Amino acid sequence: MRARDLLGPWGEAAAAAYLRKKGFRIEAMNYRTRLGEIDIIAADRRYLIFCEVKLRKSADFAAAREFVDSRKQQRLRATALLYLSQHESELQPRFDVIEIYAPAGTQTRRPQITHME
């Protein structure tokens, strides 16, 4: 597997570790349906978050969060609604984006993480 192909799973694992440190319990990772995919579904006492993880080597071209366009948001919403129809929850649903900047070779160091709630 190419190093580039390993970055996505590495970024999602880094985002999950970040959420755990913030007190979230990971409910699902890479939740896939015919409607789309949600990278991480996590919960704390108040919220059930549907989290899109965006990993980039730098923000030179654009901020990672800018790649969550309206089409992607629609797919996330539809997938989250399907999840909620199959998993009853009293928690308030919320959509978050976790932006990770990881220059080449960063897998051995701490990435820069920004969490947009």
Give, region by region, the residue ranges found by the protein language model.
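Mg2+/Mn2+-dependent nuclease catalytic core
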Residues: 57-81, 85
